[in-house]
């Protein structure tokens, strides 16, 4: 079954934990967004893992260099997953993968900025990434003509474990499920909802 990941793009640890508390019954993976980590530091990861020891905690570092070092930092802080940019060099990804093996954790490669996402997805899985996040960032989503259907189609063609992030909501969740994605990543559809718990519950039920 496709897992549900909440991407928390808030700026304060206490706000992130408060949101996670509301949605935790329906979420498999809790993602600390890049702005949150930059705002609050590694302590946000440690606090989230302490609050939810039975959930997977995903640190969206978007690492572009020093893969082994940054992965070690994330894992020692309590993260179960770290993101490395797919647009970076293979050696950076491989370094993070080596660190992940030591800690029994996972590397996720983020395809922001990658032109041929399907090709790169296959390459980085071969390097040892656990899965690949087919990701349209907030800026790309705001561009005229953007459609999550592009990511859904790519997931169907990839033939490797992928997640989809970039406009996952109740309108697109069925397509995400049918694509074969291992994880559906919802951000604003949950944290921007009037009732985040109800929004998360509806998405989780749609994936069942």
Show which residues each predicted segment covers.
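Conserved N-terminal beta1-alpha1 strand-loop-helix module at the mouth
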Residues: 1-69, 75-76, 117, 123-127, ...
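Hydrophobic faces of well-ordered beta-strands that scaffold small-molecule active sites
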Residues: 4-8, 30-32, 57-61, 82-84, ...
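Catalytic cores of alpha/beta
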Residues: 19, 65-77, 115-127, 158, ...
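Glycine-enriched alpha-helix->loop->beta-strand junction motifs that scaffold or abut catalytic
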Residues: 24-28, 51-54, 76-81, 101-106, ...
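Alpha-helix-loop-beta-strand connector modules within alpha/beta enzyme cores
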Residues: 38, 42-61, 95-113, 145-170, ...
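Hydrophobic, well-structured mid-protein blocks that either form specific transmembrane helices
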Residues: 70-120
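Glycine-rich phosphate-binding active-site loops on the catalytic face of alpha/beta enzymes
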Residues: 79-91, 132-142, 179-203
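Glycine/Thr-rich beta-alpha phosphate-binding loop at enzyme active sites
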Residues: 120-152, 199
């Amino acid at each position: 079954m496709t897992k549900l990941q909440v991407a928390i793009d808030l700026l304060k640890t206490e706000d992130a934990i408060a949101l996670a508390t509301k949605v935790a019954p329906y979420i498999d993976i809790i993602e600390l967004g890049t702005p949150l980590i930059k705002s609050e530091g590694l302590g946000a990861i440690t606090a989230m893992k302490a609050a939810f020891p039975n959930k997977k905690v995903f640190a969206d570092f978007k690492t572009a260099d020093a893969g082994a070092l940054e992965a070690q930092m994330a894992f020692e802080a309590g993260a179960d997953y770290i993101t490395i940019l797919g647009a970076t060099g293979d050696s950076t990804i491989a370094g993070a993968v080596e660190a992940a093996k030591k800690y029994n954790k996972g590397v996720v490669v983020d395809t922001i900025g990658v032109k041929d996402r399907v090709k790169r997805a296959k390459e980085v899985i071969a390097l040892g990434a656990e899965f690949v996040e087919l990701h349209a960032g907030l800026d790309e989503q705001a561009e005229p003509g953007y459609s999550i259907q592009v990511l859904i189609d790519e997931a169907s063609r990839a033939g490797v474990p992928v997640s989809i992030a970039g406009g996952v909501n109740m309108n697109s969740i069925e397509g995400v499920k049918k694509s074969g994605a291992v994880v559906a990543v919802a951000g604003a559809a949950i944290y921007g909802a009037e009732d985040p718990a109800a929004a998360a519950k509806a998405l989780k039920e749609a994936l069942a």
